[in-house]
Amino acid sequence: MRVLGIETSCDETGVAVYDTEKGLLAHQLYSQVKLHADYGGVVPELASRDHVRKTLPLIKAALKEAGISHQQLDGIAYTMGPGLVGALLVGACIGRSLAFGWNLPAVGVHHMEGHLLAPMLEENQPEFPFVALLVSGGHTQLVQVKGIGDYHLLGESVDDAAGEAFDKTAKLMGLDYPGGPRLAALAEQGNSDRFTFPRPMTDRPGLNFSFSGLKTSAANTLAANDSDEQTLADIARAFEDAVVDTLVIKCRRALKETGYKRLVVAGGVSANKHLRAKLEALLEKQKGQIFYPRTEFCTDNGAMIALAGALRLEAGEREPLAVKTHPRWPMTDLKPMVNISDAV
């Protein structure tokens, strides 16, 4: 099955073509970082309007890259949620309209399921069951995964997501948007021994997270010290260490509670080199396996939507003609899949 995937949930326009026999045929991505930079964050109205301008040209480019015409597609998948409602509507309306005009089946995909399945775009694919750490600007969750659509939430952030905490702290430090990657880059120059921040909620049972207090700790430390480059780097390092250690501690607990030996890490923060190194060390110590997508598929992209959509379309799922979006959509609301082929 050959599927066109469309991702427009936030500030990236992603389009891809995925073939269940040949793998990824095309991948086109446009980032709105420059558009939102002057505002220090995503402006929903501007994001929606830019998706309107960019989605159709990217679809044409993806089909050209794949070397196919729309007549050679077998289905269309689009992000149905969660995300910014206006941005979601752009992708959903375009995807559903093209499916109707081209007489193709369509399916709406859960954005976070796309992230969770993104490692299946790689040659080294995880087998079920596994624990998934989904860590991004909007979500920080630990999920027990028994199969596609068979998800049990083990823990999540009770306030800020990890990526959100990175971005907010970077803004406090005066770093340009997008702040998270810039803070991580600055942290590489920092001394890990100068400052120490707490590891929130690791002193009690459970798998939930809390990162808003770390932002407060960083703000207090910034206010009490000089703002020279080395001090900022040291604070960035202490902040990153605290976030990464917290994530690693919770992953260790989740693996112990489930008895699983496989960990999938996905979402924008999964590209963090410090996080990857510490999680790899954890899984090596436990004689387990860790899986994550290549860096370009850690952030939002159309490839993960095309893959997830292809699996659901092959299993017989179809969307009605009505265009629906779910700006808020718990992943645990999804139903377990049946009749999944060996497409991946």
Curated annotation (Swiss-Prot):
It is found in: Cytoplasm. Its EC number is 2.3.1.234. SUPFAM superfamilies: Actin-like ATPase domain. It catalyses: L-threonylcarbamoyladenylate + adenosine(37) in tRNA = N(6)-L-threonylcarbamoyladenosine(37) in tRNA + AMP + H(+). One of its GO terms (biological process) is tRNA threonylcarbamoyladenosine modification. Gene3D superfamilies: 3.30.420.40. The keyword Cytoplasm applies. Fe cation binds at residues 111, 115, 300. GO terms for molecular function: iron ion binding; N(6)-L-threonylcarbamoyladenine synthase activity. Substrate binds at residues 134-138, 167, 180, 272. It comes from the Bacteria. Its main location: cytoplasm. Belongs to the KAE1 / TsaD family. Required for the formation of a threonylcarbamoyl group on adenosine at position 37 (t(6)A37) in tRNAs that read codons beginning with adenine. Is involved in the transfer of the threonylcarbamoyl moiety of threonylcarbamoyl-AMP (TC-AMP) to the N6 group of A37, together with TsaE and TsaB. TsaD likely plays a direct catalytic role in this reaction. PANTHER family: TRNA N6-ADENOSINE THREONYLCARBAMOYLTRANSFERASE, TRNA N6-ADENOSINE THREONYLCARBAMOYLTRANSFERASE, MITOCHONDRIAL. This is tRNA N6-adenosine threonylcarbamoyltransferase. It comes from Idiomarina loihiensis (strain ATCC BAA-735 / DSM 15497 / L2-TR). The lineage of its organism: Bacteria, Pseudomonadati, Pseudomonadota, Gammaproteobacteria, Alteromonadales.
